[in-house]
Amino acid sequence: MMYRVSRTVTTCFRKKPLRINIQYRSFTKFDSFGDTPIPASKQRFVPTSGTYPKGFLVGSTNVGIKPSGLSQPDLVLVTSEEQWETCGAAVLTKNEFPAPSVLVTRELIKESRGRGVRGVVANSWCANLLTGEKGLEDSRKMSKEAGMVLEEGSTKGKDPNYSDLGMGGQRLPIDDIIQGFPKLHQNMGTAHNHWLQAARGICTTDTFPKLSSRTFTLPSLPNTKFSIAGITKGAGMIHPNMATTLGIICTDAPITPSALQQLLSTAADKSYNCISIEGDTSTNDMVTMFANGAAAPTHSPIDFDILAASQSADFIAFQRILIEFMADLAKLVVRDGEGATKFITIRVRGAPTYPAGKHIASVIARSVLFKMGVYGKDPNPIGVLAALGYSLMDTEFAGKGIINRELTSVSFVPADGAEELNFVKRGKLMEVDELRVKELMEKEDVEVVVDLRDDGSGNGEEAIYWTCDITHEFVTINGDFRN
């Protein structure tokens, strides 16, 4: 669902058909992205099996939204069976020009407070941004028709409500979408391939589908296995501000609506909101999550008490699990950045607060000079220091002595666990082994550590950002976007 790159639509739903909205992105020479083989270097990121949450059904189909000749799915539905008390939560783009779908989704979550919000319908390769009243009518029609089809075809009385996330410039092929809903419903299931095909169905310029799942336990139920699964997408227009891509996450753990929203918002801040490809925050993006409690239907749900000094052990444990899980999904997005050849970790240590450290890391992650240097296999620390030097200008952190040249060190950490290479030590450039530098920069994974307080005390907060290099291919993809 990114405005220039994603062409994906997302739709949350609950009890009765609500409203919907979608996305558009017009491809020409890159229309072939949809059916190209997964690059050999990326195949290791695509799981061949998984463990998926109980009570969730996933389906996908091709309704002809993608350019003629492409066979991959372009319409996706993820929903919890109605027998389970399900709640939903979402984090939405903070771009000041949000798509109507974002506004509708925000309204739905606000009105329902997450109760009864059971799933998402999404389409790729066509958006609905900047299409006026006709586009809004298409969205509402899509929502209504999808709900009617699910109601008629369900043995469990499904009657969903929809809202969606989208992109703009051209109206949806609404008739094709409506005609595809019965087939979409027939294709729903719980197997690994259902999830994998759904992950394929939200891809646009992605080179591989992004899917992850895992099991976990909670302190109060150590013998009960819970599951969490998620699909995500995004290859360009990626920079955090409360959702930077489309993400759909489901768990069969019992969680109250208020707790789910709190858990998702906190986890997004330390995962999806810590990635950047080219520094552009999309108008359409959303990460949404659903919990149905199907793995422990009689157990008291995880709750959130805003007045409590601390939360329950289950809440704390699940928060940690969710942050790790969402970080793994978010890193898959970066690994598939448009044209990217390097996966870069920016680690800032010694910051007085986490927000300050995160802000510094985000500025370095957006430095075109630094990112192009990594692409050219030149680890020149000047790009890092330049970005660090201006990172706090005109911010709430300016003038507070956070950056001290005489205490600042910059090093590159080899992916193989070898000793790190110190390029700057307490403000001074260091001589380095050029052979080791060459070996380091040949690796796909590059980690840069910026220590703001290299005084041996170990004091301060640590913040991490993930980004990628800027390549010739990135320029080609975006320069030829509509040609």
UniProtKB/Swiss-Prot annotation:
Protein name: Arginine biosynthesis bifunctional protein ArgJ 2, mitochondrial
Membership in a protein family: Belongs to the ArgJ family.
Assembly description: Heterodimer of an alpha and a beta chain.
Native organism taxonomy: Eukaryota, Fungi, Dikarya, Ascomycota, Pezizomycotina
Catalyzed reactions: N(2)-acetyl-L-ornithine + L-glutamate = N-acetyl-L-glutamate + L-ornithine; L-glutamate + acetyl-CoA = N-acetyl-L-glutamate + CoA + H(+)
Example of a GO cellular component annotation carried by this entry: mitochondrial matrix
Coiled coil feature spans: none
Biological role stated in the UniProt entry: Catalyzes two activities which are involved in the cyclic version of arginine biosynthesis: the synthesis of acetylglutamate from glutamate and acetyl-CoA, and of ornithine by transacetylation between acetylornithine and glutamate.
Residue stretch of the organelle transit peptide: 1-26
Active site: 244 (nucleophile)
Annotated organism of origin: Botryotinia fuckeliana (strain B05.10)
GO biological process per UniProt: L-arginine biosynthetic process; ornithine biosynthetic process
Binding site for substrate: 204, 233, 244, 338, 478
